[in-house]
Amino acid sequence: MSDSTTVASLLAEGEELFKISSLHYGHGLYDAWDEAVYLLSHALNLNLSLDRSMLLNVPSKEEVAEVRRLFRERSSEKTPSAYLTSRAWFCGLLFYVDRRVLVPRSPIGNLIKQKFQPWVPVPPNSILDLCTGSGCIGISCAYAFPDSKITISDISEDALIVANKNVRNHKCSGQIQIFESDLFGELGDERYDLIVSNPPYVDAEDYRSMPAEYFAEPALGLIAGDDGLDIVRKILCEAVDYLHEGGSLIVEVGNSAAALEQAYPDLPFLWVDFSEGDAGIFILTREQLIENHNFCK
């Protein structure tokens, strides 16, 4: 046993290390304390809530070594904690993740928790999660709408291996179809009540200046040309052919929102206002896309 290293002292050690390591907290954890709690809880198989009674526990020598190994790798390599643990939370659900997919963090999760109300007034019978990555958005939709048919798709075969693992882990195989597809290319003539997408939308300049943690993620899931709109342009032009009458398109574009409005000044984007401060998600209906579809010419 370690003579004096308690859970509390390990947490303090990790927090201090992270504070002096110039870490970026943009992958589901909010500060140095959160990172320390997350990694220690994983290594010691403890609940994330960390009851106060646990703080004076004295881990074994081997456990202390494992916690410190995770702390060192997070601080020195700038590896997102989700990749160190192969775990990430989204919409209150636990997902397997690795470097083949982005770490789940989309504010679309907040919309799913609200069942897309009031923007989608009728529960959708069919949902497409385009550019699914880990599958977290589509799987979360399956929980929110248990009677809906869900399709998830991605261009990356590697990402779909992870998504398929998550579908199996959440026992959603009977509700979710998985397609390897370059956007709508392999989806046939299926139409959907709701298309949700968190596509690549980082522009070239932003990507070059991003914190080191983002370079651990697959560039295919982040970069989308000089203005960040290469993929979104295709989605806007093609989505109308894959939406049912009355259907809606919900897309995250993050910091590329201003470039999008400048590129399409006549499209009536509805931007979701989040109380948490998140931004960059628009909603368009099929009818709005049809009415303004001349932008695709």
Question: What are these model-derived regions, one by one?
Answer:
Residues 2-91:
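N-terminal auxiliary segments of SAM/dcSAM-dependent transferases
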Residues 21-25, 115-122, 171, 243:
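Alpha-helix termini
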